[in-house]
Amino acid sequence: MPHPHNKKIQSFWLITGIIFIAFNLRPAITSVGPVISSIRAELHMSNGAAGFLTALPLLSFAVLSPLAPKLGQRLGNERTLWLGLVILLIGVLTRSTGYTAALFFGTALIGVGIAIGNVLLPSLIKHKYPEKPGIMISLYTTSMNIFAALASGVSVPLATQMNGGWKQAFLLWGGLALLALLIWIPQLRHRDTANQTMKLQSSSIWASKMAWYVTIFMGLQSFLFYSSIAWFPEILRSHGIDTATAGWMVSLMQFASLPSTFLTPVLADRVKQQRGIVAALASVYLIGLCGLLAGGSHTLLAIWMIIIGIGQGSSISLALTLIGLRSENAQQAAALSGMSQSFGYLLAAVGPIFVGYLFDQTHSWTMPIVLLIAALIVMGAAGQGAGRDRYIFQSEKQRNSA
């Protein structure tokens, strides 16, 4: 039996490692939106091509998410997460060379690395902290959103002040990945989350109605998040806001999401059904999007961004919390995480591309914002199904007899 002091040290490094992996799951993506106009001008891209660049990590998520649980079973979640960080670092270095082909290839690699973390961290948390997944999901999602917000805010100032422009600004996030790699090294000797003790028929989860509710909720909240990260800076610029300020306003949106990001999983963990939480966050989100559609002064636009951020923070943290709440064990959590983030991110990948395409066709941001509102309404409906007190493989009869 490990000495209590050693156990505390191991727990410290595990929690620190989870936090630093979470730090890396968004900045390489959210740093792109504020400087997309500079990239587009330098590399002569259309809005559609720029939208595809933003969607590329999501396509990587969609392809890799079903494979990540299987890789975790083979290598262990700890080693697979470390491998994901290595791939992320290589992607950041490749993208920062500035060549068009390298930009797209590096971005795809970044998506592969992040996909592994996206899928396996909820499973690892479910395994390591089965009695208190809510607080750990809060810690994980809040850490993720802090650096997502920071990356949005500092991208333009860094690109402006550095000789290498946006290329050198992107390179800085490689240092964060390297730091996480080093911190996670103590976990490499563990394989206890390799999920070898139980077999789960991967095909069965696709027949679960509850799994589909969670997947659609996950997919549409991602659709909304990544569309906003990609195009809100441009929407704000259309209201007369300069590029740097637009970047900081998107950053403000993400910082505003932090309280709801942290509190939502804790609250969701304490109630049997999460349908009321879904209704509340969807209502707040809707107010913000309708406000953005209406426009207004710079101050009013900042208020709409804050309101959107509150809804956004709740939706991402609740989506991740539902993976654990609707699963009976770590194996089910890994399978549900893989499904929801595969089909879900495939759906999300359509967002930035289609929003860019709609703007190219209409030369107005009205229809793209209306599309986001429609996606939010469907997300709320799926959330009502996902918020019921039921496991993914639990029938109504089993639930009533429990």
Swiss-Prot record:
PROSITE patterns: MFS. It is found in: Cell membrane. One of its GO terms (molecular function) is transmembrane transporter activity. Keywords: Cell membrane, Membrane, Transmembrane, Transmembrane helix, Transport. The chain crosses the membrane at residues 12-32, 48-68, 80-100, 101-121, 134-154, 168-188, 212-232, 248-268, 291-311, 339-359, 367-387. CDD domains: MFS_NIMT_CynX_like (cd17339). GO terms for cellular component: plasma membrane. Induction: Negatively regulated by TnrA under nitrogen-limited conditions. Coiled coil: none annotated. Signal peptide: none annotated. It is a multi-pass membrane protein. Belongs to the major facilitator superfamily. Cyanate porter (TC 2.A.1.17) family. This is Uncharacterized transporter YycB. The lineage of its organism: Bacteria, Bacillati, Bacillota, Bacilli, Bacillales.
